[in-house]
Amino acid sequence: MEKFKKKLVEMCKVNVKAAVVFIILALFLALLGIGDSEGDVYLLAAGIFAFVAILMFGTAGTKKKRIKAQLREMEEEGSLQILYNDFSYTGAKFSKKYQVAYGRRYLLDFAAAKEGFRIMDLQEIHNVFCCNMVDGEPQETIYIALETADGSRTLVGSAAKMTEEFSGMIANLKQITRLNGGAQWQ
């Protein structure tokens, strides 16, 4: 159970490369600003880049704390055991890149929820498909759309382009919903 909880907390995505780039830019600009008559501009820009990098790391830390709090609450209620049972079989998938994890019955969306993660019952999902429309507007980003029998849709797992992993997630989710009696678009 502890390994499972740790894996869920690690689903919180931190763009370390981007944060490191901001820190390097901040250091470079600070070095340019030292001893220069117009150095104040460089130092100000360095401060802004450093602040953005700190925000990136701080946001991830806050999100991890929220996930841990949600897990503690679920453990106290006894509902964490249900998730653990679903994700303990070998076919469960965890994608930190797309911030989605799913087992045979439940899908966990780590991107959308500000307070930890959102739990979706896959037995309520009637259809799974790839979507690039949000509120009727076309998007460059593609999503996995989960549709219930009443037609309501939830978008999870955003991607800039279709990858093998993303396509595989859609195929797996389609198979799971098909087993649950859902219809699929071809």
Label each residue range with its predicted role.
Residues G103-V134:
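Phosphoinositide-binding peripheral membrane targeting modules
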Residues E2, L44-Y102:
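Anionic N-terminal interaction surfaces
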Residues N15, L27, M74, G78-Q81, ...:
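Short, flexible helical or helix-coil boundary motifs
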Residues K97-Y102, R118, A145-E147:
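Short, exposed beta-strand/loop patches in secreted or surface proteins that constitute
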Residues L8-A69:
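Alpha-helical transmembrane spans
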Residues M1-V14, W185-Q186:
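Short, Lys/Arg-enriched, disordered terminal segments
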Residues V128-Q186:
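Acidic, Ser/Thr- and proline-rich intrinsically disordered linker/docking segments
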